[in-house]
C-alpha cells in the first residue's frame, strides 16, 4: 500500500445514523484538506474537556498518521468527498450530529449540533454523558 492509499470499509446498514454536514462546513473542510497534499480527510471524536465533561473534536488527518493495517477500533467512510475517520467508542456520541460552519461574532467556527444530548454547559461548547 503506498502512502496515499487508504484502507476503508463501509458501515453495515442500520448500524450508524449518518452525520450531516452543511454546505458551508463541507466547503471549509475541503478547503482545509487541500491546503496540504498530505491531508486525506478528517477525524471526528469526543474529548474530555469543558465544564460539562466532553467536547466534540475535528482534526485534519494526514496520510502519514494512519497505521499500515486497518484498526478494528475505528470506522471510515466518505461523506461528500470527505474521508471521515471515527473511533468506534465515539460512534454513540456522534450518531445524528450536524456539523455547520457559522459566523460567531467576528470569527467563523465549526459548530456541532446533536439533538440526542440533553446536558450542555452554559457556553454550549461541552456536554455531559449520562
Curated annotation (Swiss-Prot):
GO terms for cellular component: cytosol. InterPro entries: Fe-S_cluster_asmbl/transfer, FeS_biogenesis, FeS_cluster_insertion, FeS_cluster_insertion_CS, HesB-like_dom_sf. GO terms for biological process: iron-sulfur cluster assembly. One of its GO terms (molecular function) is 2 iron, 2 sulfur cluster binding. It comes from the Bacteria. Belongs to the HesB/IscA family. This is Uncharacterized protein BU122.
Amino acid at each position: 500500500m503506498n502512502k496515499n492509499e487508504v484502507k476503508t470499509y463501509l458501515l453495515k446498514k442500520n448500524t450508524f445514523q449518518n452525520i450531516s454536514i452543511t454546505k458551508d462546513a463541507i466547503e471549509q473542510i475541503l478547503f482545509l484538506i487541500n491546503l496540504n497534499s498530505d491531508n486525506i480527510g478528517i477525524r471526528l471524536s469526543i474529548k474530555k474537556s469543558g465544564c460539562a465533561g466532553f467536547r466534540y473534536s475535528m482534526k485534519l488527518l494526514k496520510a502519514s498518521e494512519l497505521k499500515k493495517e486497518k484498526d478494528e477500533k475505528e470506522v471510515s467512510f466518505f461523506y461528500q468527498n470527505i474521508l471521515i475517520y471515527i473511533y468506534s467508542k465515539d460512534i454513540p456520541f456522534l450518531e445524528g450530529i450536524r456539523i455547520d460552519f457559522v459566523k460567531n461574532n467576528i470569527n467563523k467556527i465549526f459548530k456541532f449540533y446533536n439533538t440526542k444530548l440533553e446536558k450542555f454547559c452554559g457556553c454550549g461548547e461541552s456536554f455531559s454523558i449520562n
